[in-house]
Amino acid sequence: MGGTFDPIHHGHLVAASEVAAKFGLDEVVFVPTGQPWQKMSKKVSEPEHRYLMTVIATASNPRFTVSRVDVDRPGPTYTIDTLRDLRTQRPDADLFFITGADAMAQILSWKNIDELWSLAHFVGVTRPGHVLDGMGRKDVSLLEVPAMAISSTDCRTRVAAGNPVWYLVPDGVVQYIAKYGLYAGHADPGPSAALTELHEPASTE
């Protein structure tokens, strides 16, 4: 499951669980983007912060893992590079790329689109009532997930306004956001400090 995860919220987790159940997936790999090319002009939290929040959010589910392939790769993040790396790591796996409705709506503008179709089956998750075009392709599936009404943008806005995000994001992520002053204009000690204090492993894979 690819995404900025800035921050990861319960909508992401429910969507991943629903897709895993529907398609009988053995594992869901969360892949936080490094430098998302679509958001180069927008402020995005440091990759290590987003990676660690994803690790915290997924730790209790044995079917969920987190990959650093995009975080560790220099330069802008493109899905084609993500899928190539995952294919190299899992040559015998049937890959499903799970992403949100907003990303699926732009998929035809993505880099190396023809190769993308050959590398994975794409699953677009959306909130009920949101119309999403499956482009008539057998390798694209659409799935409505009620919890996708939660958005990372709304979570960031709430934090910036001093409003709570409990029950929108996992408890550990709420505490992480508060500890490092994310989204509230507080001083950010940086991802290296976060790594040192949390003692997280370099990778969960």
Curated annotation (Swiss-Prot):
Transmembrane parts of this sequence: none
Keyword Protein biosynthesis appears in the UniProt entry: no
Pathway membership: Cofactor biosynthesis; NAD(+) biosynthesis; deamido-NAD(+) from nicotinate D-ribonucleotide: step 1/1
Record field: catalytic activity: nicotinate beta-D-ribonucleotide + ATP + H(+) = deamido-NAD(+) + diphosphate
Keyword terms, alphabetized: ATP-binding, NAD, Nucleotide-binding, Nucleotidyltransferase, Pyridine nucleotide biosynthesis, Transferase
Domain of life assignment: Bacteria
GO molecular-function terms, A-Z: ATP binding; nicotinate-nucleotide adenylyltransferase activity
Family in the record: Belongs to the NadD family.
Function: Catalyzes the reversible adenylation of nicotinate mononucleotide (NaMN) to nicotinic acid adenine dinucleotide (NaAD).
Protein's UniProt name: Probable nicotinate-nucleotide adenylyltransferase
Species in which this protein is naturally found: Arthrobacter sp. (strain FB24)
Name of the gene: nadD
